[in-house]
Amino acid sequence: FFKVLRSGTASIVTDKIDRITDHGLLLESGDELSADLIVTATGFNLQLFGEIDLCIDGRPLDMSRTFIYKNLCFSDVPNLFCVLPYDKTSYTLKIDLVSKYLCRLFNHMSKTATRQCMPCLRESDYEMESIPYFKGIFGGSDPKPGYIDRAGDNIPLRCGDRHPWRFTMNYDEDKRILAGPIEDEVMRFTT
């Protein structure tokens, strides 16, 4: 595969298929790809937390009403963390940053005898723009993989237009944010 790609006789195209033609595929961009053989694939569908029904105190949790905090947890949801990957950078870089932050957070909770941490919107945050998670990642113009297009309603996460609710895809920015103080005006600790 890579030998053929380097030779210049093959290329990679990101587009959507408009229809199958006598000679191959007509793409929505208007380009036609010649093909002797077309292999179809169903792809996969993203699921948030494996479609687990999350509850807080017996009440169902509507994740579409939460905002992502520092790219790792959610507003008004206690003690729930996840690693949201970068789109163009190694997942392990993000895992390393989040792991270090969580170790600091758990050590802080142990030292302060707190059992729960939960980011809460500040009064000024209620006026911020609510940006769907995948729009926050890809913006409006980048071509997206099909599984991202299909994920819209399955991944109801939102980010905001300001720190710490703004979603980043930048390792250096995440490193700076996650190296900051554990206690801030957003994270609430309770016993």
Which residue ranges define each predicted feature?
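Flavin (primarily FAD) binding-site architecture
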Residues: T40-D57, N79
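A conserved short coil-to-beta-strand element within the FAD-binding core of flavoproteins
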Residues: K3-V4, G8-E28
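Adenosine ribonucleotide-centric catalytic and binding domains
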Residues: L54-I68
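Core beta-strand elements of the Rossmann-like FAD/NAD(P) dinucleotide-binding domain
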Residues: L26-L37, A41
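C-terminal, flexible cofactor-proximal segment of oxidoreductases
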Residues: F67-I68, N79-T191
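Detector for glycine-centered tight turns/loop "hinges" at secondary-structure junctions
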Residues: G30, G58-R59, N154
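Generic recognition of stable, solvent-exposed alpha-helical segments in well-folded globular domains
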Residues: I12, I20, L33, L37, ...
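Short FAD-binding loop at a beta-strand-to-alpha-helix junction that anchors the flavin cofactor
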Residues: K3, S7, S11, N71-K88
